[in-house]
């Protein structure tokens, strides 16, 4: 399981990536994250991030009927959100590249 402190800076970008594919509701986002290996992310963590995305104009939300139970709030990325996602991906790749280089160097020193 990935430590929550490590997830803090990346979870919002991962949620944007999920809702960029198709409109999705909170529980389904949590399930997709779990399927990708993020472990069980509490909906209480996901919903504040979704609301922030919506407040900042990065996502739109609409209620849709559910086959079971009450209506669900589906989130979709806006054009501004897609730009932010592209920026996140570029920054994330830069960060992971730097971390990989450092870890590779450390690995070479320990042998």
Label the predicted regions.
Residues 21-25, 55-56, 81:
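Short, charged/polar surface micro-motifs in flexible loops or helix N-caps
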Residues 56-71, 76:
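Beta-hairpin "wing" of winged helix-turn-helix
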Residues 83-111:
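Amphipathic alpha-helical dimerization/coiled-coil segments
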Residues 33, 37, 63-65, 79:
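Short, well-ordered turn and helix-capping elements at secondary-structure junctions
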Residues 47-54:
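Short, hydrophobic-biased segments on the C-terminal half of alpha helices
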Residues 3-47:
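N-terminal helix-turn-helix DNA-binding core of bacterial DNA-binding proteins
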Residues 71-89:
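Basic, amphipathic "hinge/linker" alpha-helix immediately C-terminal to the N-terminal HTH DNA-binding motif
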Residues 1-5, 62-64:
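Short beta-strand/turn micro-motifs at beta-sheet edges
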